[in-house]
């Protein structure tokens, strides 16, 4: 297959996925691995991570590695179709906080939560099995992501340093109305014992003090 023909075939698909395409999706539309290798050698596409390429005509973007990892976890299915799948993986923990610019949690390893047990041998990738409901999922730059409320709670449940979580909470409070904050206050206090505090400990207020609010 000629390079121009391969690029023409891939152009619409890549345009719908922020300039990215997986090897599996390329093969599904008739562009095999040899054609992809030629396109890469000739400077038409660039490898973002194993099995994921970006068009060199498309700009790189801040969330690129997270988006590429999300595509790679179900690499045969186009992004637009996955957006309707409630069982799909969802960016979570530090990765979700980083996507939403909440606090200073480390986004690595790139972390996704799924209601089903999933595994991946990809380095730098973490998959967590946990319950999720529709209201706990939002879209951030085209990536399914845990809601800000859930993103505050998950690090606490994981035993993350409370000083780091307090900064996530600080930025959450900046962007949310009092009605939402009241609900989060209750849920934060409910996990206090899991964080090693006695029953009834006002964890929400303690985090506010830590964040100097």
Residue ranges of model-derived segments:
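Short gly/ser-rich loop at a beta-strand->alpha-helix junction or flexible surface loop bordering the NTP-binding
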Residues: 2-8, 15-147, 151-154, 158-186, ...
